[in-house]
Each structure stands twice: as structure tokens, then as C-alpha cells.
UniProtKB/Swiss-Prot annotation:
Belongs to the glycosyl hydrolase 25 family. SMART domains: Glyco_25. It comes from Escherichia coli O6:H1 (strain CFT073 / ATCC 700928 / UPEC). This is Uncharacterized protein YegX. It holds the Pfam family Glyco_hydro_25.
Length: 272
């Protein structure tokens, strides 16, 4: 039975080979064009994503960037930061982490203090973010954030996560966002980073706050649709896997050099 199957397979392969040779002989130009086109499509597909498939991280990593990081919140629960910092694959390691601190007027992420301390202790650059609630006073939200986060030299500037406008007009939303940014900048001495999705940015924020660094979320794209935004960070996936973290985690890249990255963490005022 085994010999019969093997012979049948060989015969099938021979027929396919003869058929391919016949096609090439009859339609040489068309065949060459087909294979060339297919090769280009494969190349473009690979280039479309960047493209470095990294098995351990379970995602494709944009290949044009060398500085990689994650962002986390209570949804990742208890993180083993030592394992996160030690993870390496295909020349890629995680160098920074943005950590959720607060939301709205009252919510403090239950894992923030632990994440804030251990990420730094294990050698990652760290940043803290506030999820902006459009229905709550911007000044109240800024005070909550500043009371929660103890900035130290070497930390990223504060981050404001703007993803919804509720019942506000885009103009009113921008006014409240501006209030938060100015309060936090005055206290920390550094312009905060603004995080938003590409679509929300285009609809509500494009053309404003150009003096601030941007962190854009746009998944599974060759590059983010930035609509003229001079972005510094790109959240390119929400499906990454990292040692020491249960479940999926957001992945980000920094758009710049190591020296430029250092500029982000220089000069922030320490806060109690």
C-alpha cells in the first residue's frame, strides 16, 4: 500500500511538472509576467506590514523601527516585569512601557503603583497616561492624575488618552483637552503626549495641538494614517504576546532615534 501511494504521488508530480513546462513553452511571456507579478505581490505584502514576523511576540513588527514598547492597564492584571524586560526575539526587545494611571475624575488603575515601580526597576522607560472623560471637568481630571503619578527624572512626559467626545462638540472637546494639557504641562515642565486613534484624530483633533507630541493608534497598517500629524509613537497592534503578561497586549514603536527618545525623558519635573 505504501509503495502504491508513493508511486501515485510521483506520477502526479511528474504530470504537474510536464504541465508547467508546456504552459511556459506555449505562453512564455504570460508565464514570466505571472510569476513576476506574484513575486511583487508577495514582496509588497511583506513590505505592507513592515515586515518582521516575530514568533515569540505573536505579531508582525514594523521593520523600519528599532525602538519598541507596550502599554498596559488593569486588563493585563499582575505583570511579571522581570520577564517582560528579559524577553528577546529576532533582535527585538521592549524598551518602554506606557502605564494607565487614572480615568475621569475618580478612577485610579488598581495596578498602577505596582506597574509604575516595577517597570522602572527592571530597566524600562516608563510613561503614565490618563484616560480623558469628556463629561468631567478637565481641571478635576488633571488634579487626579497629578496626585496619582510621582514623576521622576527619566520618565516620559504625561500622556492624555483622548478617544471619545460624548455629547460635546469637537470644539468644546478641544477646549477641555487644552485645559488638561496646560495644567499638566505647568506642573511637570514638559508638554504632554496626546494619544488618539487615527479616525478619531481625523474627525476631532486634526490641525490642532500641533505643538504637542502625538501617539497614534492605527492597527495592521503599513504606516499610520496620520492626516499630517507629526506622530512620535505608533500603537500598531493590540494582539501582542509578551512573557510575563497574561493575554494580549498593545505594541508600539517610537518614530525616531535613541537620542531623540532620550529627549523625551529629559527635563521632567519630579512630582510628589
Amino acid at each position: 500500500m505504501q509503495l502504491r501511494i508513493t508511486s501515485r504521488k510521483k506520477f502526479t508530480v511528474l504530470l504537474c511538472a510536464l504541465g508547467l513546462i508546456s504552459i511556459v513553452a506555449i505562453y512564455p511571456r504570460q508565464t514570466v509576467n505571472f510569476f513576476y507579478s506574484t513575486a511583487i505581490q508577495i514582496k509588497d505584502y511583506i513590505h505592507f506590514y513592515g515586515y518582521r514576523p516575530v514568533k515569540s511576540f505573536a505579531i508582525r513588527i514594523p521593520a523600519s523601527y528599532t525602538i519598541h514598547g507596550i502599554d498596559v492597564s488593569r486588563w493585563q492584571e499582575r505583570i511579571d516585569w522581570q520577564r517582560v524586560a528579559k524577553m528577546r526575539d529576532n533582535g527585538i526587545r521592549l524598551q518602554f512601557a506606557f502605564i494607565k494611571a487614572t480615568e475621569g475624575e475618580k478612577l485610579v488603575d488598581p495596578y498602577f503603583s505596582r506597574n509604575w515601580q516595577l517597570s522602572r526597576e527592571n530597566g524600562l522607560l516608563r510613561g503614565a497616561y490618563h484616560y480623558f472623560s469628556p463629561s468631567v471637568s478637565a481641571s478635576v481630571q488633571a488634579r487626579l492624575f497629578l496626585q496619582t503619578v510621582d514623576f521622576s527624572q527619566g520618565d516620559f512626559p504625561a500622556v492624555l488618552d483622548v478617544e471619545e467626545r460624548g455629547k460635546l462638540s469637537a470644539k468644546e472637546l478641544r477646549k477641555r483637552v487644552s485645559q488638561w494639557l496646560k495644567m499638566v504641562e505647568k506642573r511637570t515642565g514638559k508638554k504632554p503626549i496626546i494619544y488618539s486613534g487615527a479616525v478619531f484624530y481625523h474627525t476631532n483633533l486634526a490641525g490642532y495641538f500641533n505643538e504637542y507630541p502625538w501617539w497614534v493608534a492605527h492597527y495592521y497598517q503599513r504606516r499610520p494614517d496620520n492626516d499630517g500629524m507629526a506622530w512620535r509613537f505608533w500603537q500598531h497592534s493590540d494582539r501582542g504576546q509578551v512573557d510575563g503578561i497574561n493575554g494580549p497586549v498593545d505594541f508600539n514603536v517610537f518614530n525616531g532615534t535613541v537620542e531623540e527618545l532620550q529627549g523625551f525623558v529629559d527635563g521632567i519635573k519630579e512630582t510628589p
